[in-house]
Amino acid sequence: NNIAAALTASANPTFEVTIAGGRIRQEGRDVLGQQVEQFFSAYKVDFGLFGVGGVDADGSLLDFTEDEIRARETISQNCRTKVVVLDHTKFGRAAYVRGGHISDPDLVFCDGEPPEEIGAMIRDAGHELVTAGDDSAALALLPEFAEAGE
């Protein structure tokens, strides 16, 4: 539901990108609203990628609006592999609406190591944490993406 991500993905000639209609949140260029929930409910996809506004010390995934949470929950319910992509500034960042836990996504991609407690929550759930610079691990986890990029 992010316009920038859709444009980046569309640069790969082997990808077909379909985007949802709805209201654009200017700050993150996310498309939000009931149309987004209806759109994602109509699909069952291999990978659901999403970001978060923040991650609390207890592992709660946080965002700034209920619309963002509902979009993320709908994407999560309609994909086989849940992938959260975030940067280190999200850890401890205050946001107001809780929706999910850091141990929920199957894969967590981050630009660096998360706080030790957060990393333990991910690993204890049996899920993968991939940090920047760990390209071989990322490609091994997502072979479909590796093949598409060749």
Model-derived features: positions:
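Conserved phosphate- and dinucleotide-binding cores of soluble alpha/beta proteins
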Residues: 4-150
